[in-house]
């Protein structure tokens, strides 16, 4: 399913899951990210040792982007979002 930008109900977007035609996947290895790729496979593979299965710490900060009257896309206070993420990670000793 393809949804055109003009057909989205921008005022009511939330953080619930919305399946898209493609997902972007990039891997981090040896201190660097690879070039990544688009895929139609929406599944992920997790190691049995993944912290998410072991009551680990986690931080979520939602950054939203909006379309302005002139059609530009802007992020709402990304600097403050990044600071909140860093503060939360520090509180959980994740830095």
Give the role of each language-model region:
Residues 1-95:
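Conserved alpha/beta cores of soluble small-molecule-handling proteins
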